[in-house]
């Protein structure tokens, strides 16, 4: 019985690592400072970066907020010029939001983009509903 339990736990732990592993993607289109589009197998998806909020640059009700365009341009330049663009789902969050956007951590050439945006003043930490895997890196 113990051997079966150990085998089951080993398989479970290995499989969860594959589910939430980083996935290399292709940049498609800029939207704003915390949202952009990617291609995966020739299908386009909208990305919403977890745990941060940038000033709005295209919001229909809020309009353009202070530093919204700068945050959007900074993010766009980072993802558009990335040699390697990767996303990673968080095991403590849904994969999509109510708008159908993928909720992910974003890595540009191995660097956590959310951390970069916060450190450079383009984003603030926000929308922390769970204990996310990279939250401590943002502080």
Regions inferred by a protein language model and the residue ranges of each:
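Small beta-barrel nucleic-acid-binding modules, primarily SNase/OB-fold domains
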Residues: 2-10, 17-139
């Amino acid at each position: 019985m113990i051997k079966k339990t150990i085998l089951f736990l080993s398989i479970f732990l290995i499989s969860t690592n594959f589910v939430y592993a980083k996935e290399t993607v292709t940049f498609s289109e800029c939207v704003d400072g915390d949202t952009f589009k990617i291609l995966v197998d020739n299908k386009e998806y909208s990305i919403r970066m977890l745990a941060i909020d940038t000033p709005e640059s295209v919001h229909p009700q809020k309009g353009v907020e202070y530093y919204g365009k700068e945050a959007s341009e900074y993010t766009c330049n980072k993802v558009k010029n990335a040699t390697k663009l990767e996303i990673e789902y968080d095991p403590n969050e849904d994969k999509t939001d109510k708008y159908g956007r993928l909720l992910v951590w974003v890595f540009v050439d191995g660097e956590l983009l959310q951390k970069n945006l916060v450190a450079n003043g383009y984003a603030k930490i926000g929308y922390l509903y769970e204990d996310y895997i990279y939250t401590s890196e943002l502080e």
